[in-house]
Amino acid sequence: MELSRIEALYGQVYLEKHSYLNPQYTQKFFDDAVSLMGMRCLCLVDTLDRIVAFSLISHKQRVVTVPALGYDTHDAEQGLYRHLFAALYQELSALGCWLNYSSGAGDFKRKRGGVPTLEYTLLRAPAHSGWMTQGMLKLMERLGSKVTVERMMAWGA
């Protein structure tokens, strides 16, 4: 694992793009996370086998969190963030796991002066999925349609 590249990609996203107030993880941190803390690193590589995106994965029972990620921000046309999460979702699906997505991030950002912005996640069942899956998604659609932006903001979203 190219720890220097992973550290650099993390820095591009969390430090350069967002804020130098974020944790400044080092190569040693990433090495310890994998070798001592049991985390894994999912990496996307380009045609030259160079890491262009990564996500650090913490897996507890059937729930996965991503405590750190990074990608090459110098080439926005590649959509590396979307590719990284597509690869992550594909792996989670194969493992039968759930992703704890942005847990607590809203409160964390508000305390640092962030402006609340709603995030959306699209759920779509494949056309060939069974009636039970289709039915569950229809139920979720009905329940979700009752949740308004105003309610979400009142709940602290």
Regions found by a protein language model. Give the residues of each.
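Polar/charged alpha-helical tracts
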Residues: M1, K28-S35, A94, K138-R142, ...
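A conserved beta-strand-loop-helix scaffold within acyl/acetyltransferase catalytic domains
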Residues: M1-A76, A157
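Generic serine detector
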Residues: S4, S19, S35, S55-S58, ...
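Residue-level signal for the start and early helices of compact helical domains
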Residues: R5, L48, S55, Q90, ...
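Arginine residue identity/basic-tract feature
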Residues: R5, Q12, R40, R50, ...
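Generic, low-specificity signal for short hydrophobic/alpha-helical stretches with a mild N-terminal bias
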Residues: G11-L15, T26, G70, Q90-E91, ...
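Active-site/acyl-donor-binding loops of N-acyltransferases
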Residues: T47, W98-A157
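Acyl-donor binding region in acyl/amide transferases
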Residues: Q61-P126
